[in-house]
């Protein structure tokens, strides 16, 4: 848990890898995921690095594997995924694996090419068969003829499509037949008419069934056409037009006998092609099935091998070119494991000289590593979305685990809605190992990754719903109301009590639609409800007034407490980075400013709750009036909340006023004094460095007289940038801006926490409206068919509840809770200017086969 409170302590290590063992050592490091490599060749182009040839080889293997997977998927062969990830292949097996894959690719491409050629021929023959069958009915040929030229005979009794008649017209007759796409028929016919000027006769017929296109493989509707034309020039034009419209043109037989012979030959060839094609497909499937057994492991191995060579390209060679030098960031807790990994890699490679490491001092800021598990990962992602934490600063995710779902539940508080959300999240948690959940769509995967956040959000919503006594907009009477209506009747009191108090009788009850319970009447109010809000408030006409007052005060208390806690966490940062002057000159004035104004407001709210009861509530002073009078230095007309209130309030205002100049000028003046004081001891300006720690700029002395900080810059994780001179103006302006932002932020952020009240009220009112418009109407149906009406009403109510109150309202409360943490809470102590620790780990490669192919 200490790691979750603050990031891991990191160190910079130098690895000395022998050339013969570097590959195996990085393979072991990739399996363990211990270190993050630094690029020592930033000025070298990626095409000029040492292992660029090996990287290209891996890319070629990836291309081959992608082709194999494409063919396997096309054949509908299942791709098995291994339960365990295979290790990176040894170097001596890489060439063998490359030869096997290349040989398999060549064989597959050849078989696939032959298969496609056979399939195309088969489809063309099938089209030819259909064309012959359909065109047989187009025209009649009474006798076989040869084209000749004759005189023009009379045409009164001749059929237009009789070929003997056409022959006698004195022109040379030709035919073009084939198939055309259904969508191109009209344009095709218009083009023929315009180009051929009417010297063609086109006849169409639609095929009964769609056929597969031999070129594209798409199944479409086809039209069979037969074009009769006169003259060779017209024939050339017709053929060119057919080519432009991608028509499938086939030879047209001149005689019925020729048609019969062609048809018989086509049937024989089609049967032969079917037989050959089936055998080819069977052989291809056998090859693909055999390849599918090992393709998963090959893909993982190639990806690991490529990652290793990318890391090797980030290393530099020594002067002898026999040793690779790498610089890595490593958690100090994993240094022993790092040494063991290097020893294991050297042993597996069989090298005589082992690889080794040593730590080196550095003044650079290390990356941030916060170890998480499946429960804390979601909350850490919420924090990292704002900004990765600076090195070694307090991590808000530890507290977000509780505060985030709690603030969400304050806005979403409903026992019924929270219980439904809890059940949904619990279902995801119990089935978290189900493979379909990890491979689901993006929205469902988002819910799955945040299942523990949803679980706590639902659980806290149940808790706040019990406090609000709100279950689907209705109150639950678990312990019995503590308000007694019968005690308000005059018959239950003595005559003396009746004269002193306003009591009820039958006449008052009949003539007044609204009656008020007086808690000062004995027996009316019997103490507070054991847990949550009394259910009788659900019947009161002033229910909203009471709930608004309660939720508004609760929001203010929670908000100020949340922000004060953030300022206190900043003190832990200053202590850790040895900036103790920041505690006295920044954190304490901020706390005094916050507590003397807004902390006192919380005190007045709680004091009024404790001192004034229901019986004395009429004499209680208004907190709003008292708080305004505090700043106007006005005396209270009601005598105040407690004796000596004016003196206490003036003291608090005095402390608030005095804390502002300290907050504005304290830190810059102290740094100026520190700078001049150290200069008097003989340390020049060059003895100072400007330490950029997150977004702050502080000046510290690095000379031998530095007693407090000494040489702890490495421990503090500060990025040091040498500065030529001490710029007091820049430091002063930075601190003034920060102070103004904080003082104004205390007011605006406190008002921002009122969204807890606003969204809680909106959720409750929307839930109440939904109940009144649906369930209230459905439950009042008292006819014999009431059940039949109620069932669809309940179903519609459930659907609207899920989509509106759970999803839409839940998303709204979720976003507002994120806003409260990012802006109002984290800006009090969290800088978030770090870089995330990204280790060289094979686990970061996708474990799902479908993603590996992308």
UniProtKB/Swiss-Prot annotation:
<feature type="transmembrane region" description="Helical">
    <location>
        <begin position="394"/>
        <end position="412"/>
    </location>
</feature>
<feature type="topological domain" description="Cytoplasmic">
    <location>
        <begin position="825"/>
        <end position="854"/>
    </location>
</feature>
<dbReference type="GO" id="GO:0007035">
    <property type="term" value="P:vacuolar acidification"/>
</dbReference>
<comment type="similarity">
    <text>Belongs to the V-ATPase 116 kDa subunit family.</text>
</comment>
<feature type="topological domain" description="Cytoplasmic">
    <location>
        <begin position="672"/>
        <end position="739"/>
    </location>
</feature>
<keyword id="KW-0812">Transmembrane</keyword>
<keyword id="KW-0375">Hydrogen ion transport</keyword>
<dbReference type="Pfam" id="PF01496">
    <property type="entry name" value="V_ATPase_I"/>
</dbReference>
<feature type="transmembrane region" description="Helical">
    <location>
        <begin position="652"/>
        <end position="671"/>
    </location>
</feature>
<keyword id="KW-0813">Transport</keyword>
<keyword id="KW-0967">Endosome</keyword>
<dbReference type="GO" id="GO:0005886">
    <property type="term" value="C:plasma membrane"/>
</dbReference>
<feature type="transmembrane region" description="Helical">
    <location>
        <begin position="550"/>
        <end position="569"/>
    </location>
</feature>
<feature type="transmembrane region" description="Helical">
    <location>
        <begin position="415"/>
        <end position="431"/>
    </location>
</feature>
<feature type="topological domain" description="Vacuolar">
    <location>
        <begin position="413"/>
        <end position="414"/>
    </location>
</feature>
<feature type="topological domain" description="Vacuolar">
    <location>
        <begin position="765"/>
        <end position="785"/>
    </location>
</feature>
<dbReference type="InterPro" id="IPR026028">
    <property type="entry name" value="V-type_ATPase_116kDa_su_euka"/>
</dbReference>
<feature type="modified residue" description="Phosphoserine">
    <location>
        <position position="695"/>
    </location>
</feature>
<dbReference type="GO" id="GO:0036295">
    <property type="term" value="P:cellular response to increased oxygen levels"/>
</dbReference>
<feature type="modified residue" description="Phosphoserine">
    <location>
        <position position="700"/>
    </location>
</feature>
<keyword id="KW-1003">Cell membrane</keyword>
<comment type="function">
    <text>Subunit of the V0 complex of vacuolar(H+)-ATPase (V-ATPase), a multisubunit enzyme composed of a peripheral complex (V1) that hydrolyzes ATP and a membrane integral complex (V0) that translocates protons. V-ATPase is responsible for acidifying and maintaining the pH of intracellular compartments and in some cell types, is targeted to the plasma membrane, where it is responsible for acidifying the extracellular environment. Essential component of the endosomal pH-sensing machinery.</text>
</comment>
<feature type="transmembrane region" description="Helical">
    <location>
        <begin position="786"/>
        <end position="824"/>
    </location>
</feature>
<dbReference type="GO" id="GO:0051117">
    <property type="term" value="F:ATPase binding"/>
</dbReference>
<dbReference type="GO" id="GO:0006879">
    <property type="term" value="P:intracellular iron ion homeostasis"/>
</dbReference>
<dbReference type="GO" id="GO:0001669">
    <property type="term" value="C:acrosomal vesicle"/>
</dbReference>
<dbReference type="GO" id="GO:0000220">
    <property type="term" value="C:vacuolar proton-transporting V-type ATPase, V0 domain"/>
</dbReference>
<keyword id="KW-0597">Phosphoprotein</keyword>
<protein>
    <recommendedName>
        <fullName>V-type proton ATPase 116 kDa subunit a 2</fullName>
    </recommendedName>
</protein>
<dbReference type="GO" id="GO:0010008">
    <property type="term" value="C:endosome membrane"/>
</dbReference>
<feature type="topological domain" description="Cytoplasmic">
    <location>
        <begin position="570"/>
        <end position="587"/>
    </location>
</feature>
<dbReference type="GO" id="GO:0046961">
    <property type="term" value="F:proton-transporting ATPase activity, rotational mechanism"/>
</dbReference>
<feature type="topological domain" description="Cytoplasmic">
    <location>
        <begin position="432"/>
        <end position="445"/>
    </location>
</feature>
<comment type="subunit">
    <text>V-ATPase is a heteromultimeric enzyme made up of two complexes: the ATP-hydrolytic V1 complex and the proton translocation V0 complex. The V1 complex consists of three catalytic AB heterodimers that form a heterohexamer, three peripheral stalks each consisting of EG heterodimers, one central rotor including subunits D and F, and the regulatory subunits C and H. The proton translocation complex V0 consists of the proton transport subunit a, a ring of proteolipid subunits c9c'', rotary subunit d, subunits e and f, and the accessory subunits ATP6AP1/Ac45 and ATP6AP2/PRR.</text>
</comment>
<feature type="topological domain" description="Cytoplasmic">
    <location>
        <begin position="1"/>
        <end position="393"/>
    </location>
</feature>
<keyword id="KW-0472">Membrane</keyword>
<keyword id="KW-0406">Ion transport</keyword>
<feature type="transmembrane region" description="Helical">
    <location>
        <begin position="446"/>
        <end position="475"/>
    </location>
</feature>
<dbReference type="InterPro" id="IPR002490">
    <property type="entry name" value="V-ATPase_116kDa_su"/>
</dbReference>
<feature type="topological domain" description="Vacuolar">
    <location>
        <begin position="609"/>
        <end position="651"/>
    </location>
</feature>
<feature type="transmembrane region" description="Helical">
    <location>
        <begin position="740"/>
        <end position="764"/>
    </location>
</feature>
<keyword id="KW-1133">Transmembrane helix</keyword>
């Amino acid at each position: 848990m200490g790691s979750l409170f603050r990031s891991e302590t990191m160190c910079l290590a130098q690895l000395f890898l022998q050339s013969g063992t570097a590959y195996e050592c990085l393979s072991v490091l990739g399996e363990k995921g211990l270190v993050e490599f630094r690029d020592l060749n930033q000025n070298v182009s990626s095409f000029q690095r040492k292992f660029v040839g090996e990287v290209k080889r891996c890319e070629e293997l990836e291309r081959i594997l992608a082709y194999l997977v494409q063919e396997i998927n096309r054949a509908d062969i299942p791709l098995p995924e291994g339960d365990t990830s295979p290790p990176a292949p040894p170097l001596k097996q890489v060439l063998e694996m490359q030869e096997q894959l290349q040989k398999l690719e060549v064989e597959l491409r050849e078989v696939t090419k032959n298969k496609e050629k056979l399939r195309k021929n088969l489809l063309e023959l099938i089209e030819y068969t259909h064309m012959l069958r359909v065109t047989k009915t187009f025209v009649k040929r009474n006798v076989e003829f040869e084209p000749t030229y004759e005189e023009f005979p009379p045409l009164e009794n001749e059929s237009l499509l009789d070929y003997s008649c056409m022959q006698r017209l004195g022109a040379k007759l030709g035919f073009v037949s084939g198939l055309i796409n259904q969508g191109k028929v009209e344009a095709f016919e218009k083009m023929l008419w315009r180009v051929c000027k009417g010297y063609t006769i086109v006849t169409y017929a639609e095929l009964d069934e769609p056929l597969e296109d031999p070129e594209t493989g798409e199944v479409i509707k086809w039209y069979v056409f037969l074009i009769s034309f006169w003259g060779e020039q017209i024939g050339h034009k017709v053929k060119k037009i057919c080519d432009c419209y991608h028509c499938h043109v086939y030879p047209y037989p001149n005689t019925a006998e020729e048609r019969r012979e062609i048809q018989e030959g086509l049937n024989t060839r089609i049967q032969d092609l079917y037989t050959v094609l089936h055998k080819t497909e069977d052989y291809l499937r056998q090859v693909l099935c055999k390849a599918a057994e090992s393709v998963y492991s090959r893909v993982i191995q190639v990806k690991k091998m490529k990652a290793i060579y990318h890391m090797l390209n980030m290393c530099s060679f020594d002067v002898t070119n026999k040793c690779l030098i790498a610089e890595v960031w490593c958690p100090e807790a994993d240094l022993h494991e790092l040494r063991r990994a290097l020893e294991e890699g050297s042993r597996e490679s069989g090298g005589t000289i082992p690889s080794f490491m040593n730590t080196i001092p550095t003044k650079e800021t290390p990356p941030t590593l916060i170890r998480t598990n499946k429960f804390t990962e979601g909350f850490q992602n919420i924090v990292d979305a704002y900004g990765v934490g600076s090195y070694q600063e307090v991590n808000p995710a530890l507290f977000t685990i509780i505060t985030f779902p709690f603030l969400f539940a304050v806005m979403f508080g409903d026992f019924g809605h929270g219980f439904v959300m809890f059940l949904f999240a619990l279902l995801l948690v119990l089935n978290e190992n189900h493979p379909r959940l990890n491979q689901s769509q993006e929205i469902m995967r988002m819910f799955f990754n945040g299942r523990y956040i949803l679980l706590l959000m639902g659980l806290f919503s149940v808790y706040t719903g019990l406090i609000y006594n709100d279950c689907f907009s209705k109150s639950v009477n678990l312990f019995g109301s503590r308000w007694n209506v019968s005690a308000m009747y005059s018959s239950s009191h003595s005559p003396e009590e009746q004269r002193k108090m306003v009591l009820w009788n039958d006449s008052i009850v009949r003539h007044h639609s609204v009656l008020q319970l007086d808690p000062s009447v004995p027996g009316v109010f019997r103490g507070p409800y054991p847990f949550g809000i009394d259910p009788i408030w659900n019947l009161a006409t002033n229910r909203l007034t009471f709930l608004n007052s309660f939720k508004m005060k609760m929001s203010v208390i929670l908000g100020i407490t949340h922000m004060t806690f953030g300022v206190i966490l900043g003190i832990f940062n200053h202590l850790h980075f040895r900036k103790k002057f920041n505690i006295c000159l920044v954190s304490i004035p901020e706390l005094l400013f916050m507590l003397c104004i807004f902390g006192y407001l919380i005190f007045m709210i709680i004091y009024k709750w404790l001192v004034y009861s229901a019986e004395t509530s009429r004499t209680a002073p208004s907190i709003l009036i008292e708080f305004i009078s505090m700043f106007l230095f006005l005396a209270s007309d009601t005598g105040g909340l407690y004796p000596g209130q004016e003196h206490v309030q003036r003291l608090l205002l005095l402390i608030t006023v005095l804390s502002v100049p300290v907050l504005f000028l304290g830190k810059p003046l102290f740094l100026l004094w520190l700078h001049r004081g150290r200069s008097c001891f003989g340390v020049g300006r060059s003895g100072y460095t400007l330490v950029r720690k997150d977004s702050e700029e502080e000046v510290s002395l690095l000379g031998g007289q530095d007693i407090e900080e000494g040489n702890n810059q490495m421990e503090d994780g500060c990025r040091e940038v040498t500065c030529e001179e001490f710029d007091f103006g820049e430091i002063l302006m930075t601190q003034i801006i920060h102070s103004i932002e904080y003082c104004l932020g205390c007011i605006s952020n406190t008002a921002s926490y009122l969204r807890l009240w606003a969204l809680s009220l909106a959720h409750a009112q929307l839930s109440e409206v939904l109940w009144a418009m649906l369930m209230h109407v459905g439950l009042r149906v008292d006819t014999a068919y009431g059940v039949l009406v109620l069932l669809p009403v309940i179903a519609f109510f459930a659907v609207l509840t899920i989509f509106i109150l759970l999803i839409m309202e839940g998303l709204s409360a979720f976003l507002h809770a994120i806003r409260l943490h990012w802006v109002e809470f984290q800006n009090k102590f969290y800088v978030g200017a770090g870089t995330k620790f990204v280790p060289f780990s094979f686990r970061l490669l996708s474990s799902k086969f479908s993603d590996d192919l992308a």
